[in-house]
From Swiss-Prot:
Keywords: ATP-binding, Glycoprotein, Hydrolase, Kinase, Magnesium, Membrane, Metal-binding, Multifunctional enzyme, Nucleotide-binding, Serine/threonine-protein kinase, Signal, Transferase, Transmembrane, Transmembrane helix, Unfolded protein response, Virulence. It catalyses: L-seryl-[protein] + ATP = O-phospho-L-seryl-[protein] + ADP + H(+); L-threonyl-[protein] + ATP = O-phospho-L-threonyl-[protein] + ADP + H(+). This is Serine/threonine-protein kinase/endoribonuclease ireA. GO terms for biological process: endoplasmic reticulum unfolded protein response; fungal-type cell wall organization; intrinsic apoptotic signaling pathway in response to endoplasmic reticulum stress; IRE1-mediated unfolded protein response; mRNA processing. The gene is ireA. It comes from Aspergillus fumigatus (strain ATCC MYA-4609 / CBS 101355 / FGSC A1100 / Af293). One of its GO terms (molecular function) is protein serine kinase activity.
Amino acid sequence: MRWRLPGARTTLPASVALLLLPILVAPQQLQEHDDLPSTLSVPLSPTQRSFDHHPLPTINVKSNDASALATMALAGPGRAVRARPAQASSSSAGLAPQLHARSLQDWEVEDFVLLATVDGSIHARDRRTGAARWALEVPSSPMVESIYHRANRSSFDRAQPEDDFLWIVEPSQDGNLYIYSPGPDAGLQKLGLTVKELVEQTPYSGTDPAVTYTARKETTLYTVDARTGNILQVFSSRGPITSGHGCRKVDGFDLEAEECDTPSGTLVLGRVEYAVAIQNTETGDPICTLKYSEWTANNRDMDLQSQYFRTMDQSHIYSMHDGVVLGFDHSRMDRPRYTQRFSSPVVRVFDVARPINVESPEAATPLVLLSQPLQPPDPDYGSLDDRDARVFVDCTSAGGWFAMSEETYPLVTGRAKMAQCYEKDYLRHGQPLTSLPTSQQRDALAGVHSLNGPRVVRNTPSISGPSPLELANDTPRELMRSPSELALPPALRHSTIIRKGWDNAVDIFVTILLLFFGAFIYFNSHNIQELAKQKLDVKNIIASYAQPPLSTPSTPVVESTHFKRDSSPSRPISNLTVEVTVPEEQQEGDATPKPKRDRSAVGPDSTPRVKIREPSRGPDSDDDVEELDQAASPEKPKKKARRGRRGGKNHRRGKKPDSEGESKDQADRVVDQVNNLQPQSRLEPDLQLVRTVSNDIIEMDGVLQIGRLRVFSDVVLGHGSHGTVVYRGSFDGRDVAVKRMLVEFYDIASHEVGLLQESDDHNNVIRYFCREQAAGFLYIALELCPASLQDLIERPGDYPQLVQGGLDMPDILRQIIAGVRYLHSLKIVHRDLKPQNILVAMPRGRTGSRSLRLLISDFGLCKKLDDNQSSFRATTAHAAGTSGWRAPELLVDDDNRSAIQGGESQHTESSEPAVVDPQTNRRATRAIDIFSLGCVFYYVLTRGSHPFDKNGKFMREANIVKGNFNLDELQRLGDYAFEADDLIRSMLSLDPRKRLAPLCSSLAFRLFTDLFPRPDASAVLMHPFFWNPSDRLSFLCDVSDHFEFEPRDPPSDALLCLESVACRVMGPEMDFLRLLPKDFKDNLGKQRKYTGSKMLDLLRALRNKRNHYNDMPAHLKAHIGGLPEGYLNFWTVRFPSLLMSCHSVIVELRLTKIDRFKRYFTPVE
């Protein structure tokens, strides 16, 4: 029988490939060869069939993931395996007798772990500190050995194609195989085959290529004292072996004592040794011998291993290439708990588990080894593009080559160097790779390789093909060179470095130019800033005085000695035409103007005349317009200001005398145009704001003194949009953050300040202090915060004073939603909620609280809703917010909504009034903040991940539009995972206007559904995710009490609604009693009988045992845990959806207002 690769050739590289690769790859790739099975399949006996264990979540695990260091269970990602009882009349099939079903919940992790190293040793280390306990060095052979028999042949023998291959084994589960081959396409390749699979396919002998494979497999089992590491028993396929270790005497001074000390626990540890011999079929000469040994757990415990998807205490150990191991505790946001170094890299990690309930405490407890599951070290780790392609290769002291891939061992290549074989040519022409000494091979190959490349680039001489016009035979040789070689001086053509530099001369020149430009900007930044300030000052002065007045003004012309001031801070008027004469002195702020002097008596310049013209703004402006009517004559008093109306409706004015009718009609039209274009803006001509007075600001040693505000311009805290810079400052001795903005963005600053003044009376909204203007800038003083939420989540180590007591994630999210709820109560929609705009501050001293304060900040894009308005219009071209954090309704126009006339309201399917923009046919509500908060919540709970990063960060908005999010990382939260998933899923609802379908109308009810409406801030604050354990347990007991009084024969609609969620809560088995421990069920049945398929009985059992908790035996209470948290966890671990299912039933039945449940659905003020 021949195995061939498609399209094989008789060239040397093809021969090499035919020699080795087809044997390994063909069984997996070529399905047409049916005479040799590609895998060995053993049918399960009736007692070995598996079925689902409902409470544990399904997690997809790659088959070749070894773990953080070790591998996943051999049983794969299936759930708990329970042995089905065999028939009484027949014997059990398989290797093991019938076993009772075991649950991982009945086991606890020991305080030490076992680490297997490449040199073949087993080390017991402390789980929390990494301190050494004991080491097992039997046998002493390394895990990987590779013997190449080229060294046994004469140097005069002809080189064989197989001499150019190196076999490399990854000491993970079953031993993944790699090969390295030199040549033009040199590189590391993964065969997709393991040593175990190769052994199972032997014996095999072929003629094309003429290669024979034979193999053997030997197993040894050790029983070890878990406390001392002494080997108690040895079982081997080669026969009985004496352990060589005596037992520990009870009396250490009595050497003749016969009684031995009973070990507190025993470990069963297996070692499987594989050996594969590769020989030439024709000559019988040996080619290579591969030996691989791996440490394994007892296969009897595969039922527990198949349930072990995450460690019990969130502790993981990661291995580095140089023997260093890092111990992490993922439940805490800090750096590695400990670091230890071994003489050889650690390749397997086993957690040790002990049963909680021990029948005989005096006997030695059999402990179980569980291969530690894979856990990424960081949420962003899985997004690295080339993570799975990076492999570290090295060899043992005996010359055995081994590999450690980043896919199997996260962080292993972090500090390793790239292999030198891709940079230098270590082989002379025709020299086999295996003929080199081991030291030279290691110098060339040891290091990081990439499965996607790089490949060695050889400067192989070649003959260029003819050009469209065939070259004549007398074409000079120099003209046949490449352009880069032709331009290079002949003396430098053989220098690789110079030739590469010459080929990339343009890139190098541009890089150097940019570096010089960057250095120039850096060293002259202060001078550039000063020039920019001076230019702005000159621009303001010229704009105020140098522009000639137009013959026909576009806004009213006001003639008065002074103007009535508004209570709001004064604003600068840009692009104004001002003609000023000095009026008679009067006190600033006087509400009553003094009598004007007769113009003839005083002179033509005695009365100030101010002509104001402000450029129109776009239709998105929502500021009020204060109309200033022109005085008919100097003797007439100024008319009272009148506010404009939204929507651009014109005021109807009373008629004037005929002599003024024409001019007044023209003025009315001008005012109406201003109202339409610029609603809610104020025209407050203040002559002091037109010019910037140089002595308003005092600058000394990087400190600016502006009134009561001091700005430290050399301490920059951050940068924002519109040229905004945030400095450290002080206001009346209080440390503040000073936000500096250009005067051109005065409207934005005034808008932000107005909202801050209105909303800063809340613990979770940033506080506003003052505002100053000087030198062409506006300065806003705000509360100073040491970090933002993004800083706290992504770099907690930089803020030890904030995280010293740990982070209470639910409290952080509760404060954020409380601040947003307060803004929404004031009809303020933030529109730019993201981690950067949520600041973190220390608790205030007078409150006595130790929890951090979360503050909503950056109100530059906020919208204020008018009375009876619950939404506003936005366009996709001017959608507010930050990319990746915006709601889908801001990104997609609603084409299904009919066009509405501008300035009118409409009723949507949710019966909410909306303000319609005539330029678009779409609205947006407070729900856009809820969507952004859903992304922020996920970001906080997963420590930096984004729910829409499924295909990378650049696809966020595309995924948002499609509603394509992924919440799998929430499973790490444990008890709160289900509630967090439900809350965030509803907040990320694609369409906020959808309404929930009737809960009990469908038998196939799914708790996770996209029909949930996006909740408001109050509903988010009342979600069960924010309930404490006491409230959660009380709620479940109240649900049980309420439904006890429902009619049962026939059952009421409410009771049917409750029972409709039983399948979701209990799983397909529909029997909650099967998931409870035997001792608990025995104690439960003493009071009354329960039907396992009834939700009512499940809630009754939970309530009754809570009420009779003190009547339970001590050992049962220790197993369950204390009230309320331990007892609640006992139930929610087995029934994760119980709380949310009952919550949904109460909401659907509209029972939230009755006295029993009212307190759960009332937000705390």
